[in-house]
Every structure is written in C-alpha cells, then in structure tokens.
C-alpha cells in the first residue's frame, strides 16, 4: 500500500488555490434597433470608438461610423443576410486594421486583405496595420528629390514625378487614365531587377471583375506582378468595401515606406469612392451638402492622400515618427517613400466640379487627359498646357532637365500659334517653323500602350525634337526616324544611353546625338 503524505497533499491544494486567479471578462454589447441597406443602428454601445470593429451574432463584422447620444451607426462589411432587429452586437475593442507583408506581393486581395485570386491563403510574416492613421509630421519628412520614372515621354520630360509626391491623373472616361497608371507599374520592372524596387499597390474601386482579370493578366505578361499588390473592391461589392479599399491599400504602402523602401500606390478611382461614401453618409442620415456629398468629403480624401510622403533618411529620427503601429516599431527605417497617383473621372471635361477641384487642391499637381486629343490619335492624350507637377521638377535628373527645359514652353507656344493659324493662311517663316517643330514634337511624344521607354531613349529623342533636328523629315515618317535613331544609338553608343540615365550631359554627348541624327536623315530621307 502506498505511503500517502497528507501534509504534501494539503500543501499542493493550498498552492493551487493561491495560484488561481479568477478574472471577470466584461463584454459590452448592444441591440440592433433597425437595419437596412448595409447600415445598422445599435443601442447600448455607449463606449464604442469611431472606426472600431464590432461583431454581429452570425460572425459578420461591422465598423462604427456614427456616434450619437442614444445609438451608434454601423456599416456592415458584407451581406446583411441573417441579421435582424433585436440581434446582439458585441464590441471587439479593435480599430479597423489589415494584415500586410511582403508575402502579399503578386496577389489579388479585397479591402479586408482576404485573397480572392484562387491561389489559396497568404503565408508569411504579416503585420497588423491600421486603416486610419495620422500622416507623418513635418519633421519626419524630406523634400521630394528622387525621381519616379514612369517610362512615358510626355510625363518624364514635362510633368516629372518625384518619389513621395501625389500627382493626380484626371480626365473623362475612356481617355487612357488606367493605361497611364499600369504603364507606370510596368516601367518599375527594371528597378526591381536592379535590386532597387518600387513596390506597387494598385487599388481598384467599383470596376468590373473582368476588367481586374485583364489587368492581372497584363501585369503577369510583363513580369510586373511579382512586385505588385492588387487590391480590389468590385462594382458588386458593398459601398463600405469601396470606401475602405483606398485606406487598406495605403496601409500596405505605408508598411513598405516605414521599413525604408519605396512604394507607389494608384487609386483607380477616387470618384467612385466619393460616390460610395456619399451613399453611406446618406444612409447614416448625415446632412447632405453640395451635390449631396457630406460635409467631410474633402477630409476623406485629404487625410488619405496626406499619408503619401518621403520619410527622412535619418533612422534615429524616423524611429520616433508619430503614430507608428506597434507591429512594426522595431522595423522602422528612414529614407522610404510612398508616391500616390490618384485618378479622378470628369464629366465632359469639367474639372471645376466638386470632387475634381477638391483633389486638385490636395495633390502636388495634375495630369489632364483630353477626349479630343485621344480621338485625334494623340496618345497618351495629355494636355501639357494645363498639366503641372508642382514639386517634381526638383526630382528630375540633370540630363533630362537640361534637354527638356524649354520643351513645355515650346509646345505651349505651338498650341497658341496653331489655333491662331486657323484664322489665316499668311504666316511668316518664324511662325511656320514653330508650328512645324511643334507638330513633330507631338509625333515624338506619341507612345504605344504598355511600352514604357527607357529614360536614356527619352532624353535622346527629345533632344532631337527640341533642337529641331527633324525639320526635314515628313510628319508621317517621324516615328520611323525615331525607331532607326534609337536602334542605332543602342547598337553603336549604348554607353551614351547609360550616361544619359546617370544624369551626364556634355558637349561630346550633344555632338554624338547630332551626328547620329544626321546619319539617319542622310541614309533614309535624302
């Protein structure tokens, strides 16, 4: 028989009792008083926070958007099927957030970060980032001095974009806005291959699923999906998903920015987000303002776009940045940037309506696309006269800045004289020369879709245009000259192209570019 020591048993029981801590878990809940159109009014959540996630009885999540004296207004993230008046709603204490990480690259996700591309779950290191976050303070920012190459001749020469800038793409439907953005993503491949990637986030709002599928296929064909995250809220998704899609995309971009890397985010387009936000605001019974938009529609876009910035290079200062999420506190590095290209759709070219004027005033410049130019075969259909980049010029490399210095002015002068020439046929030789030069420059700026140009090629052909080397070439042969000219430079003077991309420019390079142009002209046009 075992020798049982009752003293030991007594001591063990006492220890277990002393180690036991009973903890009351307080769960705050409320009751749905009415629900409809994706919005629920709930009584009882007196301590709810704006932007907090709440959970319904069937597991569906919602976000608190209205805080009133007696109840809170909640938008549902998903279908309201199975939810009814009298159901319980529980606070989670969590602010709306999304899991982000490098493992998201190459995937298609929704506004909640859930993959929808049929490739299974996302595996890897993920970090929780809030959807809503304060923009970096002034002391944590640096001036925009590093270029973001788009590969589009008209933009890189006359409307340059810098890393950390916010440049609006604006125009009517079917003028090539999305194409400009996708071409910019494709052009980042060479930087990815060189080990200095610009990670891209393409946020689609209110588009058809078939359109997204074609964009994914296009990026795959150009090997651009490996450094891109596609976040989509389709036309069939709820208004809430469309409103929060840009915020989710920005959280992903901020992860790359705050860990010392460069990122580019495209919002396609914020007009549809504004419409979805108007729908939610009206359902929440907020007072409508101009064009029935709520009073805080400007704040919706300003707080979103202000988060795009160039972070200071000093790691010590960057580590103290305001409002850093705890999940990435130890990964903060300086020198990162988040560049944004918001897209706005106009109606009949009217840039003076409410949403376009709001976003123009928030951003650092705009690229305006015109239907008339598009229909006349000038593609990309950029009106360089009213397009502007307010901070990008300081980020332009030396060689491009020197060669394209008078380019925009020349084209503006050409536009003015061209319209004037329609009223009379008697023009002096100087005016005729300006018009002929302008027409050839327009031919130079034309570009096929999904075919971004190397920076060195851009500089070389723009040099030929600005120095009037094409004056003897027929207008319909300018593209033929361009092809032969760039091929010859690539075959015989590839080192010159490399020097131009490094910012080098001198009389020797000018001489080579002149001689090559003359050789091509003498061979094919004389």
Curated annotation (Swiss-Prot):
Subcellular location field: Cell membrane
Assigned keywords, A-Z: ATP synthesis, ATP-binding, Cell membrane, CF(1), Hydrogen ion transport, Ion transport, Membrane, Nucleotide-binding, Translocase, Transport
Feature type site, description Required for activity: 387
Catalytic reaction list: ATP + H2O + 4 H(+)(in) = ADP + phosphate + 5 H(+)(out)
Function according to Swiss-Prot or TrEMBL: Produces ATP from ADP in the presence of a proton gradient across the membrane. The alpha chain is a regulatory subunit.
Family label: Belongs to the ATPase alpha/beta chains family.
Name assigned to this protein: ATP synthase subunit alpha
Organism: Karelsulcia muelleri (strain GWSS)
